[in-house]
């Protein structure tokens, strides 16, 4: 209903402008036009509402209701508004409730039924701006030689969902995995490798990732406790950075082993992502320092090179520096992130030519990225009209409100968590089959359990406000009741059941007979028509939970519709009308679940 909303807003703005000019108050227009027309706070009030008359009362020095009467009179003279609106009613002290005409809603619903995208518009590229339509989403980003743990879950699925939404809108999306594949830790890892496999480094290819994690712990223990090992590790870092062939070989083997584990998890979660680790930006680090120096924003402080940040201070109230080169000449995460942001906004072939970059990390990195973005803007590496966003998220907690860990106090491996979700989903399914005295094949049970289990984990995360911490509970997320993936999947299965029972064939010619009268039909229509507005809002504020909340409300609305009106037993025209609503609900659900990275089922 976005097109209708935009047209309605445009016409209300024109009427507001006419009113202001008539009263010699034209200068107030820009301030008053903000949120001039909004979604109605309650369904019974109408489709939209306008509260501007309360503000106009202060300007015109009149009672708001008196102004509302004058404004509604002006609006009713607008032919475009008359074509769209059934009524403009004044309520309370001066609110204007807007109700759209039935035929306007029916035409819109017909259009969405026929649209494979359920009414979601494609972006229109602004050729005059010179900007590309490329969006980079930087997410997941595990570290080499470490297993992915539950902390990587949020970044991975939030980043994937945001990517899918931008792709649906028609953006060219580059999904980047900024893996931690470089740094001083590789000095100790390679030294340990050479100590253990001095005769044949290829032996590392036979090590499993779980062994590699223990290997990392053993390396760290030696580094912390053995001065001679520590010395050799630091020397190994220099060798690696200078391109020593043996060191590079060992580094590649470590990366390859980790990559196998990462890829297994990404395949299981249906995540598409391009690996481009920290090492990719190594050749650009020196030029980052040189460029900052050339632009006279680099300062040397106590031997380190840094840029002092505006509006950011330490506990003593002194300006905070973003250090980009350490006292010993080494670079850090900030240097790498600055090199990355510069490369990503640079025009091809020297960069990615992005118009927007979205970083999905935990909120603990908020200050880091605020500093990096500020320095990048000072250096003019973020072009005018381009956008950079940090998408922070909270912790995954246990039901006790503490950070989710194993009974032994260890961080939970992501692979184990996902396997447990599928196991529990299978357990629930087998119990349900037994209760229903129903037989299904092993293939059906395995596939259904996988889709429900993984879908439940994803949805439980995405349905939360990403900024807050959330408590992880298998019992809640696998429930068929409430705002859960199983509830949404069940609703979709219910619609599939209606279609399987239907022996009536209808086509596009039957569209002329579509008509709606029942209250539950109109509620479902209005809910379906809000889909495009939800997607556009996520494009702006990057909050996927908006889509989850919408889907839960849509399923509730559909299930009330299903319970209150017959579908297959009605006469032809009513049956066609209601089956079309079922089709559009199913299409909207499938498309939305796909945007959340959740597979769907025909039967459960």
From Swiss-Prot:
What molecular function does GO assign, one term?
arginine-tRNA ligase activity
GO CC, sorted alphabetically, is: cytoplasm
Q: Where is this motif: 'HIGH' region?
A: 142-152
Name the EC number(s).
6.1.1.19
UniProt enzyme class: ligase
CDD domains named among the record's database cross-references: Anticodon_Ia_Arg (cd07956), ArgRS_core (cd00671)
Q: At the top level of its lineage, which domain of life is listed?
A: Bacteria
> Is Translocase a UniProt keyword of this protein?
no
Catalytic activity from the UniProt record: tRNA(Arg) + L-arginine + ATP = L-arginyl-tRNA(Arg) + AMP + diphosphate
What family does this chain come from, according to its entry? Belongs to the class-I aminoacyl-tRNA synthetase family.
* NCBIfam families, per the entry: argS (TIGR00456)
Subunit: Monomer.
Protein's name in the database: Arginine--tRNA ligase
In its UniProt entry, the species of origin is given as Prochlorococcus marinus (strain MIT 9312)
State the taxonomy lineage: Bacteria, Bacillati, Cyanobacteriota, Cyanophyceae, Synechococcales
Gene name of this polypeptide? argS
